[in-house]
Amino acid sequence: MTLILASQSSGRAAMLRAAGLAFETTAAHVDEEMLTASLRAAGQTPRNIADALAEAKAVKIASRLPGVTVIGADSTLALDDGSMLAKPETPEEAADHLRRMAGRRHRLFSAAVAARDGAPIWRAIGEAKLWIRPLSDAFIADYVAQNWDSIRWTVGCYEIEGAGVQLFDRVEGDPWTIIGMPMLPLLTWLRATGLAPQ
């Protein structure tokens, strides 16, 4: 049985490869910004939005590929005041996001949804709490300049498995959720369905 990751995230693909899974990747091309805005307007939480985005990606690809299992994944970031940060569109916006997060805690929700024949068949959501240390403007400017090509694709402007680890004082949660997918529940499910080695 074929497994597809409906994501262009290098971090998510690397996690699946490191776990020894055979899979293909394809982009779902879901309008994440529009869907997020609609869900926020409807009063949905960042946790539920991550789940809905992951489901939209998985279902979109699975509806075109009968019998294929598709994994959609997405992450959302919420500050303690309830506001959400999206992927930065410019280096200046990335710097602004980092200034807003500096010296504060935020919560990261990473969801994975499996779909087959156009319908969701499994889901899991992981949560991590992360504390970014106080950051100087000079550090932020240098960090963004050196890492823009990779952080532009992340909701928190960091890849914790790389230079982003320099941002943090404290982290609660598993590393896979922070990178972008609740791997342990996903692997348990994939083994139960025969899509991962027992």
Swiss-Prot record:
SUPFAM superfamilies listed in its UniProt record: ITPase-like
Signal peptide bounds: none
Annotated catalysed reactions: a ribonucleoside 5'-triphosphate + H2O = a ribonucleoside 5'-phosphate + diphosphate + H(+); a 2'-deoxyribonucleoside 5'-triphosphate + H2O = a 2'-deoxyribonucleoside 5'-phosphate + diphosphate + H(+)
InterPro entries: ITPase-like_fam, Maf-like
Active-site residue list: 74 (proton acceptor)
UniProt entry keywords in alphabetical sequence: Cytoplasm, Hydrolase, Nucleotide metabolism
Predominant subcellular localization, coarse grouping: cytoplasm
Cofactors required: a divalent metal cation
GO CC, alphabetical: cytoplasm
Cellular localization per UniProt: Cytoplasm
Gene3D superfamilies: 3.90.950.10
A GO molecular-function descriptor: nucleoside triphosphate diphosphatase activity
Annotated GO biological process: nucleotide metabolic process
EC number: 3.6.1.9
Membrane is among the record's keywords: no
Protein family membership: Belongs to the Maf family.
Main function: Nucleoside triphosphate pyrophosphatase. May have a dual role in cell division arrest and in preventing the incorporation of modified nucleotides into cellular nucleic acids.
Protein name, as recorded: Nucleoside triphosphate pyrophosphatase
Source organism per UniProt: Sphingopyxis alaskensis (strain DSM 13593 / LMG 18877 / RB2256) (Sphingomonas alaskensis)
